[in-house]
Amino acid sequence: MIVTTTPNIEGYQIATYHGIVTGEAILGANVIRDLFAGITDFIGGRSGAYEKELGRARETALSEMEEAARAKGANAVVGVDLDYEVINNMLMVSASGTAVTIA
């Protein structure tokens, strides 16, 4: 499945629009607390463990979005947007886009 942030896919025509699809992943309070503690410990550097955890959450959100697109009969998702939001000491990663069939 092609997933892109652009509104169209070069070399393809959008044959059908299937609507908006989303996927979410939430990191629990302990991960967030540890994440912010780690940030203060790694000022000026990078924490591979925390980046890996955020990457896992992002991949989960994108996978859920792709599954939702497949369920609608789509073979691509265009206009994808990723958002990160802290809610009640938890980090939510959400992915949204428009499910389409390309030809």
UniProtKB/Swiss-Prot annotation:
Origin superkingdom: Bacteria
InterPro entries noted in UniProt: UPF0145_dom_sf, UPF0145_YbjQ-like
Coiled coil segments of this chain: none
Xref: Pfam families: YbjQ_1 (PF01906)
Similarity field: Belongs to the UPF0145 family.
Name this protein carries in UniProt: UPF0145 protein RHOS4_20440
